[in-house]
């Protein structure tokens, strides 16, 4: 019997609505239920589309305004208010000339730091409520100029490190970038393993100063936030020459302090050391490992970059700097905190009037964020949850959940509506036709639109249905039928009623034959690389389409993506279908439980089979090392999976950590490691060497992947057995014995405190002199003794030592002590100027066989320091040389010394040279080019060149006559202001310049074209290469 309430009669519909809309997207009840809400339901509260952003305004900005953006989507359109530091801004016309609002955006004209810096928020409102934007901080940026005070020069010995201080001027914000200029703008110094600029302090660090570092340095500072750059006064860096560069241990000068960073950000840690040789820098995390794929090291180790920080990246980081003289370490703690981030946000919701509702939001962050709620822009409640009971119209409005910690504030916005409505199936009727398989299960859904929640009843035809062993009416109103048969076919009606009305909806049920698997897939056993086959046959209702779905261990096989290994065949007939799955070139990952599911639109059934895949073994586990000696270790491991084929043997491999070698098979005891073993001794190792080990298993089906490497292990120390090679030497300074060698490679140190013992003696002397060299990378030792006779034969041998003892001596080598420096000085016989910039000096050679060459030094008297003199080296076979690069009209002093490998002998007497005045600077002015009446010559004429007071007197003119495009031509000289030149066929250039005792002056050039035959050149004419290039 149909309930009385649902007999046909007039029905009253009453509707009252409140609504909740997310700020991130528009959600309108009226879009889904226009009949329920009518025209008014198209309205909704403000939803932010743009919010104001933090702004840094440059104090020197030419654009004298700041714009803060605020834009919402709302219906009706929202009105806008602005707050500064939580105080309402008066934005009426004429109230404050600095502020104006346009379409929600706040414009600040002629910004003033004292008035307009602070935190701004935008409030958007309409009839449905108000929402408040995130806070936007307005700050004023500046970067002052550097002080105009001169910077003091920095004097550093070559080989030592240097630090040039930047001392940036006052600025805001703190974020600056630094570079250094050398001598002039914009010559920025390149950064490399030896030079580093700290982006924290701006200081320039040079690990090892060289003579080429001499120059003037300026710190160049840029503020990206305000697009401004300034640079300091230049700092002179003066390297002080050392006869031999000393070595200095690594000394870390750039040390990143303990620092804080936010989750997801990138951070860079700095570390740079002074020292000679240039230190090597390495990084490690002391309480963990450097994050794989999220870290990078640059600038030869000076910078450690950590990307997309996670909380587990917090910890203690250490940089190590070392060279052959020593090591240094620095530790810094990195703390990772997080700005608020939503774990759960308030969501859109429609709630029945009088009902209960919980509005909840959860935020993560470090420190833990404080959470509170706003309603229509005002404080509503603290905590992460608001509980409503017996909702009423007064609960309507715009709600915001706000999470805040010291790193930021986030908002989640929503609009609340509560509604009341009679039941309606207009937009969600009962499914009109439902199919069910015999002996199966079906569910009719009944979900009318109604508030308060309606009472639900069901009928079949005119029969009212009740819960039984086969029939269930769920709490949500759905009707479930179990173990169905043909007698269950028919029409089913859902009735819904609440205090505002009633409604019903009807659907029909039809019964089909059940689907059955008649041939299930069979178990299979294959080896890796072989093929496997699974077959499945099913019967089904002829009126329904059947599909087969294959899955492996519960996961559907993607036949398109895995087409390399999976192929499927299907056959269909009336009421029966089959499917065959072919697995080609099987791999270990293909093993498992395969399921065939036969499925129609009404029902499905499944059958399964196991596929076993046998293959090479997996990697051994837990590789570790014990019983370490100087040349052996014991390696232990645990068996990995044998992949259903017994392990026959193990192979142990090793590599040296420092050498970054490829893995190689290790020599073991026993030589052949059986498949049931879990340890082996690795032999023939080098002492005091760091190794890694790994193990590989093999069975009859192949060799498996290697294990993870063992922890790095260093063998014990032992006495060295390798001596230095290529022992030689000789030469050097007087009264010295210079010994050279090729150092022992580091893998043969065999222990700490490695060095060399050198034994040497005159060839026929029975007494050996022994010295110790503690630098393992040293290649030379110079023994100084005033008693050493020159050019004497010495016998030398060497051996290595370490903390465990001394090694064997090398074979003896024979070298000679240094010869004496020349004892006599050359005698200068002539020193005279050739031009304004060149001179010649001639001397009487020193008649000693030990002279190898001569050094000529010259410098400007009373102007240049003798130490800065220009130097020319000349072979001992020469007794004269040409001096160039001299200054015109200047007094020079010149001296000559004989020298050899032992040094320089005494200087000759000093001679004076006075260079000529400069050649004429003005070129001749060519005034005419006239063809001779015969056509065989041409006359070139020019004005006389007058010398200036500081220039040499003109003695004549030089004329170069050459074919265009040729590097040489015919040179003429004349004292006149004109010259006749033979006319030749083709295009020619004529170059004219004045000549004086100071040299040749500036050139004038004219181009001529002739048609006469080109005569042969007279033998008396001189061919010269092209030297003049100036064209007037």
Swiss-Prot record:
Residue intervals of the Fibronectin type-III domain: 619-718, 723-820, 825-918, 920-1015
Entry-linked SMART domains: FN3 (SM00060), IG (SM00409), IGc2 (SM00408)
Disulfide bond recorded as keyword: yes
Bilayer topology: Lipid-anchor; GPI-anchor
Residue positions assigned to the propeptide: 1011-1032
One Gene Ontology biological process: axon guidance
GO CC, one annotated term: side of membrane
Record-linked PROSITE patterns: FN3, IG_LIKE
Subcellular locations according to the entry: Cell membrane
Expressing tissues: Expressed in brain.
Lipid moiety-binding residues (GPI-anchor amidated glycine): 1010
Residues modified by glycosylation: 119, 216, 266, 455, 467, 483, 504, 604, 879, 950
Intrachain disulfide bonds: 70-122, 166-219, 271-319, 361-401, 446-494, 536-596
Record region (Disordered): 699-729, 907-926
GO molecular function: cell-cell adhesion mediator activity
Signal peptide positions (record): 1-31
Domain Ig-like C2-type as annotated: residue spans: 46-139, 144-231, 249-335, 340-417, 423-510, 515-612
Keywords of the record: Cell adhesion, Cell membrane, Disulfide bond, Glycoprotein, GPI-anchor, Immunoglobulin domain, Lipoprotein, Membrane, Repeat, Signal
Family: Belongs to the immunoglobulin superfamily. Contactin family.
The protein's role, per its UniProt record: Mediates cell surface interactions during nervous system development.
Name of the protein in its database record: Contactin-1a
Upper classification of the organism: Eukaryota, Metazoa, Chordata, Craniata, Vertebrata
